[in-house]
Swiss-Prot record:
Cofactor binding, per record: Binds 1 [4Fe-4S] cluster.
PANTHER family named among the record's database cross-references: 4-HYDROXY-3-METHYLBUT-2-EN-1-YL DIPHOSPHATE SYNTHASE, 4-HYDROXY-3-METHYLBUT-2-EN-1-YL DIPHOSPHATE SYNTHASE (FERREDOXIN), CHLOROPLASTIC
InterPro entries the UniProt entry points to: Dihydropteroate_synth-like_sf, IspG_bac, IspG_bac-typ, NO2/SO3_Rdtase_4Fe4S_sf
Positions of [4Fe-4S] cluster binding: 270, 273, 305, 312
EC number assigned by the record: 1.17.7.3
Keywords annotated in UniProt: 4Fe-4S, Iron, Iron-sulfur, Isoprene biosynthesis, Metal-binding, Oxidoreductase
Organism this protein belongs to: Salmonella typhi
Alphabetical GO biological process terms: isopentenyl diphosphate biosynthetic process, methylerythritol 4-phosphate pathway; terpenoid biosynthetic process
Metal-binding as UniProt keyword: yes
Keyword Oxidoreductase: yes
Gene3D superfamilies from the UniProt entry: Dihydropteroate synthase-like, Sulfite Reductase Hemoprotein, domain 1
Identification of the protein by name: 4-hydroxy-3-methylbut-2-en-1-yl diphosphate synthase (flavodoxin)
């Protein structure tokens, strides 16, 4: 691969969500949110575990009622990934989930109650070492800011965020991160740019209500990609009207594309044409599903003919170049073997898993040598 200089990330303070470090150069955390009824403990636990299997670092859970808070207690006991409780309007729910071991509170100080109630929540968070996320959203901007600016603008979102930041500052609380989300890509991007210049707290990125699986992924890739390429962002969520598992997959794909954080197989595949010597699309789709369990970073190129195949294979960990009846297999840029086109999926899966084992063993030996 081309040796692109690493992105210089914005300097930010360090907080922890559970055991996950956020900010100050820590890996950008990928998170999602459950869409089950929180009171359905079994369904919510199953979804959280599914998110964890595909790499979720943090999972947010909506806690709108006291019944949901009681369910949260049971959920927390059954999962290991850090949980963020999403809370609005009722400060007592925040106090209750804090008692039950929540790892982070997502609140807006402006809608959680009066000054005394805000102080109670912040004091509780401080006592239990629980960070807070201030979540500003263009769709729920304060009425006076709507009237002042006429519509959601970057300046309006910034002013809203700074109100809440100043509120926590007055309470001498600095364990928080901030988001300024909007469904419009340009509005969100410019809002984050302004905020990044104003504070040194970690920033949680997201294009809110981005849309369905395809359109939402595109909008998120553009918006988050712009910010991440400028070094802005410490955690992210890809918001999709789809299975939350897809949010995690797309989030990691965005980070992989920018070479910020790699997880699992990075497939490089041609869009196919009449020159393809085997079913490239079917092969890629099948392998993506079969190899979801792999977390070891690896580039695998799957090209259907010899036009671009050899060149891509030279810079991939493993590469396949389509040929008549048999296709060339490259390993670390060197042609090693030929695979039967009629049995491509099974053969390539076997080779990939063998290479993963080899890489994992090499890393294990390196770690042992360092420890000695």
């Amino acid at each position: 691969m081309h040796n692109q200089a690493p992105i210089q990330r914005r300097k930010s303070t360090r907080i922890y969500v559970g055991n996950v470090p956020i900010g100050d150069g820590a890996p950008i955390a990928v998170q999602s949110m459950t869409n089950t009824r929180t009171t359905d403990v079994e369904a919510t636990v199953n979804q959280i575990k599914a998110l964890e299997r595909v790499g979720a670092d943090i999972v947010r859970v909506s806690v709108p009622t006291m019944d949901a808070a009681e369910a949260f207690k049971l959920i927390k006991q059954q999962v290991s990934v850090p949980l963020v409780a999403d809370i609005h309007f009722d400060y007592r729910i925040a106090l209750k989930v804090a008692e039950y071991g929540v790892d982070c509170l997502r609140i807006n100080p402006g809608n959680i109650g009066n000054e005394e109630r805000i102080r109670m929540v912040v004091d509780c968070a401080r006592d239990k070492n629980i960070p807070i996320r201030i979540g500003v959203n263009a769709g729920s901007l304060e009425k006076d800011l709507q009237e002042k600016y006429g519509e959601p603008t970057p300046q309006a979102l910034l002013e809203s965020a700074m109100r809440h930041v100043d509120h926590l500052d007055r309470l001498n609380f600095d364990q928080f991160k901030v988001s300024v989300k909007a469904s419009d890509v340009f509005l969100a991007v410019e809002s984050y740019r302004l905020l990044a210049k104003q504070i040194d707290q970690p920033l949680h990125l997201g294009i809110t209500e981005a849309g369905g699986a395809r359109s939402g992924a595109v909008k998120s890739a553009i918006g988050l990609g712009l910010l991440l390429s400028e070094g802005i962002g410490d955690t992210l969520r890809v918001s999709l009207a789809a299975d939350p598992v897809e949010e995690i997959k797309v989030g990691f794909d965005i980070l992989k594309s920018l070479r910020i954080r790699a997880r699992g197989i990075n497939f490089i595949a041609c869009p196919t044409c009449s020159r393809q010597e085997f079913d490239v699309i079917g092969t890629v789709n099948a392998l993506e599903q079969r190899l979801e369990d792999i977390i070891t970073p690896m580039d695998v190129s799957i090209i259907g003919c010899v036009v671009n195949g050899p060149g891509e294979a030279l810079v991939s960990t493993l590469g396949v170049t389509g040929g008549n009846k048999k296709s060339g297999l490259y390993e670390d840029g060197v042609r090693k073997d030929r695979l039967d086109n009629d049995d491509m999926i099974a053969q390539l899966e076997s080779r990939i898993r063998a290479k993963v084992s080899q890489l994992d063993e090499a890393r294990r030996i390196d770690v042992l040598q360092v420890e000695k």
